[in-house]
């Protein structure tokens, strides 16, 4: 669907709200990565000495910090310009939150741009809106507005109590927090009559909800849950981690 950071190849045949939503999810995932688990890399690329830079989320789930498209007017709506200029003049948390808000606006504008170009009728537009609204906003993920840890999935065999992982584990439950996190042992999962809390468990990296059988891990600093694959932690690695610090917390403390 996309022909570059700020250009697009329009294909008119058989494009559905689901196609546009898939594009939306890919771009959103890339932006969430930039502002969370890859924030150190993103921070370095936002050099205030450079020209107006934009943060682009790409359909394949990656991101790029680059100059805006040369075309005037651009084929796609453009992200906010010049976020790099504000990097050193704001608290990092506020700076990232501001970018997140602008990114949410951009993601919706791109999605409904496609909807207009593909000739979506009222029902198709409403369907697209409902799908995009089903996910937490980038701002909610970045600012911690999404309750990613207190409502969790059923514990695994590693969970001594056999119930949900606690928000704050006991001091003697070292590996419990990591390894129990998100191994499905009983029925439940993502909606469909299962534990309602599970549908509200959101990964702090990709923003996706919990699904059956996934391994997740919780940061001991910010208490945010992550897919193990999103932060490159396996169950075997988690067994040997006394206190887990997510990439965002690790990078923040390094800069401080």
From Swiss-Prot:
GO terms assigned for molecular function: histone binding; transcription cis-regulatory region binding; transcription coregulator activity; zinc ion binding
Disordered: annotated span: 149-195
List where Low complexity composition bias occurs: 154-164
Q: Which InterPro entries does this UniProt record tie to the protein? A: Alfin (IPR045104), Alfin_N (IPR021998), PHD_AL_plant (IPR044104), Zinc_finger_PHD-type_CS (IPR019786), Znf_FYVE_PHD (IPR011011), Znf_PHD (IPR001965), Znf_PHD-finger (IPR019787), Znf_RING/FYVE/PHD (IPR013083)
This protein's superkingdom?
Answer: Eukaryota
Output the PROSITE patterns linked to this UniProt entry.
ZF_PHD_1 (PS01359), ZF_PHD_2 (PS50016)
Q: Where are the zinc fingers (PHD-type)?
A: 200-252
Question: One Pfam match, by short name?
Answer: PHD
Report the GO terms under cellular component. nucleus
**Record note on domains:** The PHD-type zinc finger mediates the binding to H3K4me3.
Q: Which family does it belong to?
A: Belongs to the Alfin family.
The protein here is known as: PHD finger protein ALFIN-LIKE 4
Give the source species: Oryza sativa subsp. indica
Organism lineage string: Eukaryota, Viridiplantae, Streptophyta, Embryophyta, Tracheophyta
């Amino acid at each position: 669907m996309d022909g570059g950071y700020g250009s697009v190849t329009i294909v008119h045949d058989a494009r559905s709200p689901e196609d546009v939503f898939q594009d939306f999810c890919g771009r959103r995932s890339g932006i969430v990565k930039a502002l969370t688990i890859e924030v150190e890399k993103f921070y370095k690329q936002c050099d205030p000495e450079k020209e107006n830079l934009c943060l682009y989320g790409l359909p394949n789930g990656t991101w790029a910090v680059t100059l805006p498209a040369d075309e005037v007017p651009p084929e796609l709506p453009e992200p906010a310009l010049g976020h790099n200029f504000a990097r050193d003049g704001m608290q990092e948390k506020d700076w990232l939150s501001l970018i997140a808000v602008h990114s949410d606006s951009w993601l919706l504008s791109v999605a409904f741009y496609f909807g207009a170009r593909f000739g979506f009728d009222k029902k198709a537009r409403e369907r697209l809106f409902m799908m995009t609204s089903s996910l937490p906003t980038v701002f909610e993920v970045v600012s911690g507005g999404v309750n990613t840890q207190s409502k969790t999935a059923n514990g695994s065999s590693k969970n001594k109590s056999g119930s949900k992982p606690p928000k704050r584990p006991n001091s003697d439950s070292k590996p419990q927090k990591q390894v129990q996190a998100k191994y499905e042992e009983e029925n439940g999962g993502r909606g469909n009559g299962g534990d309602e809390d599970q549908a509200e468990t959101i990964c702090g990296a990709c923003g996706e909800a919990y699904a059956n059988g996934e391994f997740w891990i919780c940061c001991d600093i910010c208490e945010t849950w992550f897919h193990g694959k999103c932060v490159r932690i396996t169950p075997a690695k988690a067994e040997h981690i006394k206190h887990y610090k997510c990439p965002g917390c690790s990078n923040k403390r390094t800069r401080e």
